[in-house]
Amino acid sequence: LDMGHMVNAIAQIDEFVNLGANSIETDVSFDDSANPEYTYHGVPCDCGGTCTKWEYFNEFLKGLRKATTPGDSKYHEKLVLVVFDLKTSSLYDNQASDAGKKLAKSLLQNYWNNGNNGGRAYIVLSIPNLAHYKLITGFKETLTSEGHPELMDKVGYDFSGNDEIGDVAKTYKKAGVTGHVWQSDGITNCLLRGLDRVRKAVANRDSSNGYINKVYYWTVDKRATTRDALDAGVDGIMTNYPDVIADVLNESAYKAKFRIASYDDNPWETFKN
């Protein structure tokens, strides 16, 4: 996946997909009552990114729905997966379940159109804090109680805090999650980060008893770092410049081994060579 970073305004969806992104990452901030409120990153900003664009969350979802509904004038066939970077650090730990419930209601209504020909993209709920794992259970309970448990087929998970792989595995056990797991690793593009933990995550993904289905690395804006990440075997790279990632994927060394994922690829299935 060529993942566009900090896509928080509806107009940016077109912009990033047109540059080659087949996936976007969107920041979600919450109010004091754990309602998802804005798609907004805010300062401090990464280097080279635009961090002050925003929409109301529900309005962004409507724009995203149009971009991922076949037949809509705004439809992009290429856009197959959306990562919601859930900014739950503003919440108390005991609000995580509520945040999940409210997030599910927002998505059900504004993105999935109450189960009636809504947006088709796969969704990854990315949570920064292992202590907030009940966001997942709250989300699942709500879709089930609202009569749409089948939509969980479209939902995956990520803990984005660069925690020990073993601790993440334990947390998924607590949350009752047995699949659909993406593992992110990374740091703001202003700083350098080695690939040690990425290699551990890839090893877990490729082992017979690992919990990880896919690994993505963030935030990469340089060709050299892109090559290093691909050499380490990642499934996705998050970037402010999707055209840079697309260019590297077109280099002869990578063309033979990697291709841009399409909607027919299963994002919850580990790719076997």
Curated annotation (Swiss-Prot):
InterPro entries: PLC-like_Pdiesterase_TIM-brl (IPR017946). Binds 1 Mg(2+) ion per subunit. Glycans are attached at N250. One of its GO terms (cellular component) is extracellular region. Disulfide bonds join C45-C51, C47-C190. Keywords: Cytolysis, Dermonecrotic toxin, Disulfide bond, Glycoprotein, Hemolysis, Lipid degradation, Lipid metabolism, Lyase, Magnesium, Metal-binding, Secreted, Toxin. Pfam families: GDPD_2. Mg(2+) binds at E25, D27, D85. Its EC number is 4.6.1.-. The active site is at H5, H41 (nucleophile). It catalyses: an N-(acyl)-sphingosylphosphocholine = an N-(acyl)-sphingosyl-1,3-cyclic phosphate + choline; an N-(acyl)-sphingosylphosphoethanolamine = an N-(acyl)-sphingosyl-1,3-cyclic phosphate + ethanolamine; a 1-acyl-sn-glycero-3-phosphocholine = a 1-acyl-sn-glycero-2,3-cyclic phosphate + choline; a 1-acyl-sn-glycero-3-phosphoethanolamine = a 1-acyl-sn-glycero-2,3-cyclic phosphate + ethanolamine. Its main location: secreted. Signal peptide: none annotated. Its cofactor is Mg(2+). It is found in: Secreted. GO terms for molecular function: lyase activity; metal ion binding; phosphoric diester hydrolase activity; toxin activity. Expressed by the venom gland. One of its GO terms (biological process) is lipid catabolic process. SUPFAM superfamilies: PLC-like phosphodiesterases (SSF51695). Dermonecrotic toxins cleave the phosphodiester linkage between the phosphate and headgroup of certain phospholipids (sphingolipid and lysolipid substrates), forming an alcohol (often choline) and a cyclic phosphate. This toxin acts on sphingomyelin (SM). It may also act on ceramide phosphoethanolamine (CPE), lysophosphatidylcholine (LPC) and lysophosphatidylethanolamine (LPE), but not on lysophosphatidylserine (LPS), and lysophosphatidylglycerol (LPG). It acts by transphosphatidylation, releasing exclusively cyclic phosphate products as second products. Belongs to the arthropod phospholipase D family. Class II subfamily. This is Dermonecrotic toxin LdSicTox-alphaIB1bi.
